[in-house]
């Protein structure tokens, strides 16, 4: 009998009621008018008739019918009541023919609140029906509420182009990533085929994820779905059998665990930390190896490491530097390590072909040298589980892929010291600084440079430009301003063919044809911060050889591992011009030593941004995470962090994966 279903539903409702009461929480259905007292004064946008997810129905619009339901919409009134009779009648109607009329609901911050049809929602939840037809009106949050809920502001753009309500993500950037994975955007209406494919993929995933709830971390399904799409986008949009979806979801369980962890990235900040991870240190300081199996690599059976570049070594100084690092790695191990490189793998097809060749070659490790390759690297790591995959980036959280980067801000601080001395000596008190991409870690380098310059010239101003900005002609802009001290490209191997690299002094410059500055300018090189990728690769490979790569200290179970090494590990350093003053060299040497032994950081003491005070002298020091995530500029910097739309197409690819929040956020407003 249908009354039996009501009795069962009421039993569930009473259980929920008791649980909420015991927890000191409100035991009835939430009402929007109670949650948002000024709800009736908010701007209303009729969205019309649509199918909405029952799981996103959070309560009722008004306060009148709250006490009839528990918070989960299960009924509470006596089974002999008129309410129970009507509920059972609706149950029969749904079983036999379905509901004829849509409910009326208001949507606020991606949740629905019912004006008419509470019992129909209750019946739908009792029957575990995923969707229900509704006539929906959106209540537009106020500007301050939207500012506190950037993910919802982004969702509204997503809904406008996709007309999909089902996917509920909690973090900013998720909907932009979905659009990018779909090779679409949040500005133009999506084709019906794409819209239906994504919605179907989400429902296939959500059914499996709910069924595996006991084996999965408590991660919002929408957030988990984005991770799933990153890895399986090519097949996820097809109609896949449930067993295949289940197998794929289980294969990336660790990625879900990492996403759930509030401290998603675990930094390994010294080479010693990595190299002694598989050892015990006795009370006397003696290092004793743990029982970690060491692999026997020889010249006849070498460790094989593949390097995948998104660019060509002849076209990119960044790629050329990594290629030098690869060759240094081979040289350091004298035949015990063999390497191969694959250039020009920016497209998914060429990347996958490179990984396939590397796997057939027998690669033990694969290094991918651009943040833009992270998703391709992640997909490969899931497929080729016996190969260790590492990506050159910082603050990207994936269990299957380790990341590595250098603390370039340490060397930038030292070059800033020299720049300040030169700017004070020529009386201009001005320095030009050209950065590449506004990605994690880069802003710290800019600020450290500016702080170093201010320590030797308190009057100095640093003029910031971005090489990756569209139609940028930063060099001549600086020359026109009368700036002589410039921080240019970090590498000697300049893509533009000039000899303007590192920190330099422009003694004379006249406009000429082409980009070869050596023909039109007289430039004196002062110093250069340098990445020493060979040293970094040498240390990582050593951990693989001695077995410490998989030690618990480094191989965290619910965190991504990020090697972030500085001058003390030999991963970054500074080269000084021979004709620099001996006093300048001594100052740099002293502060370099203090950075290495940990007694000094460029970000000690009071810090002031363009907007005001960041840190007082007595505040806790900035954490490494704070330094990586910087999205502010020091007070003596003239310039800004560009929005993503102002960057070249090539730069936008990298910034979408690894850009600082300010860059991505402002472009979405």
Q: What residue ranges belong to the model's regions?
A:
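Extracytoplasmic "Venus flytrap"
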Residues: 305-324, 329, 333, 342-348, ...
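An alpha-beta-alpha
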Residues: 326, 414-457, 557-577
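Flexible loop/hinge segments that line or gate small-molecule binding clefts
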Residues: 382-405
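Hydrophobic alpha-helical segments within soluble ligand-binding/sensing domains
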Residues: 405-427, 531-550
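Segments of small-molecule ligand-sensing domains
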Residues: 546-669
